[in-house]
Amino acid sequence: MAKSEFIIKKNLQVAKPLCDFLEMEALPGSGVDPNIFWEGFSNLVRTYGPINKKLLEKRAFLQKQISAWHQKQNGKKIDLSEYQSFLGNIGYLLPEKDDFEIETANVDPEIGVVPGPQLVVPITNARYTINAVNARWGSLYDAVYGSDVLGDTPNSSTYSPERGARVVAFSKAHLDKFAPLVDCTWSQISKILIVDNLLSLSSGDKKVELLDQSQFVGYRSNSSGVLTEFVLIKNRLHCRIVIDANDIIGKSDPANICDVQIEAALTTIVDCEDSVATVDTEDKVLAYRNWLGLMKGNLSASFNKAGSTINRNLNSDIQIITPTGAPLILKGRSLLLVRNVGHLMTTPSILDENGDEIGEGLMDAVCTVLIALHDIKRQSGIKNSTMGSVYIVKPKMHGPEEVRFANDVFNEVEKFLQITPNTVKMGIMDEERRTSINLKECIREAKSRIAFINTGFLDRTGDEIHTSMEAGPMLPKNDMKFTKWIKAYEDRNVDIGLACGLQGKAQIGKGMWAMTDLMADMWEQKIDHPKSGANCAWVPSPTAATIHALHYHLVNVTAVSYTHLTLPTNREV
């Protein structure tokens, strides 16, 4: 990359590509005066840059003491009570204060009350990002047909009626659990009508009813008045049964059902951190420009396939007619969060008054919130957050002091962008050892804006290895999956989250299923995440989101979480 030209803005030197993007694309339409923006940005860097550096120095100071303590043990068996006292004495393990509940307000239903899958997608890939946003709805027929959920994968690129029949049988068997019928199964339904805005089902000459008729939400018809789909609901998740007698699947189905559309990726994290490499200014501008397209609702992508140009755009919402005859809007897009980088890295895109690189996390905080104003202040069209919030996930924070720092930074950003306090909602990744053991106090530091906590096996075990490197040989990383402490870490995250009042106000998440081709294994195993009381879990693809969504049909996470409220939060970590 050629060396960037820098533009002076107050006490900052800003790489020209970034400066041009902010002044020509991000600021126009945001309602923020450019002079106020640069003044606020400059003051934030001057105030919080030195604090950021001191926090990193404290990390190194604590690590040096822990390594020295282990070296002093010289290989002898560790006395856990002595070790715990040592961690407390150096300020690594902090005392827990009184119980409290979070005060987060104005969260969207997908964050607070509707459990479901969560996608993570690299923000620099517009095509993948659009696919993720549109994965709010996924075809169950396609997901099962194209994966190994049935025990095998397709052996041909041409459609197999035999495999298709197995897919339909699997899907209708799931419908029997999702929305059971009175003395009938979905495979026996032969006619579907809407009569006076109500669902009418038949099996031959026999009328059939839903066991719970309140599960019927509404329907859609085409311009000729022909029924095209009807909508059911369970555990706040919708399912659209699509009808088309002319479709290759529908024409062979006794009720002309051609697909089952599952409400799948309720939320998506668009990622500026682990899944991308945004080192140079041009990389960061690409990331921010795609975020701007999402917040404006106009992100698009084109690619070539088999000699043809394919265009991708964001889906529209879906309007249905309810049993009362009134219209109802179902969201067509996943609710978006954006993951900023943590406190560690600096960026060459902006230099401070001393000519030093500023913290990349500070730049992300300012730029991603500024861009989100295009959604927050929009008066018409499809909004990301109907509650006027922006959701930012902060990764790799070490303990309550670093969470407090992030909270203070967001306070300052809200002030100079002149938006309501706590508009920015924070997600805390519980992936560092000092955060895990002080999780309750971490949550307390962001109690008015926290909207998400999540565990992560790879980063958490990585920090365990790094912190305790001098303690002696470690288990192979893969073997750690089966240790007591990993289970305790996962359980304790849920227990503390619930004890701090996250239920109904925030997400309690579980980590990624990284094996994208092993959907049968995921179908068998990942149901453990909703069973744990967590109300979201990460998935790697729209197909995985569709399959994992079925788990939330089978498990009432809200009910499970109430049972966890009676459990102790001091499980061994």
What are these language model-derived features?
Residues 2-4, 85, 89-405, 412-419, ...:
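Catalytic alpha/beta active-site cores
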Residues 454, 460, 465-515, 527-532:
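Catalytic alpha/beta core domains of metabolic enzymes, predominantly
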Residues 500-558:
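Charge-patterned, long linear interaction tracts outside catalytic cores
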Residues 398-457, 466, 470-473:
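Gly/Pro-rich turn-and-neighbor structural signature
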Residues 2-73, 85-94:
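N-terminal-proximal low-complexity accessory segments that begin disordered
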Residues 337, 393, 426-428, 451-455, ...:
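Hydrophobic faces of well-ordered beta-strands that scaffold small-molecule active sites
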Residues 563-569:
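Conserved small/polar residues in nucleotide/adenosyl-binding loops
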Residues 252-254, 346-351, 404-405, 436-442, ...:
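Short acidic, glycine/serine/threonine-rich loops at helix termini
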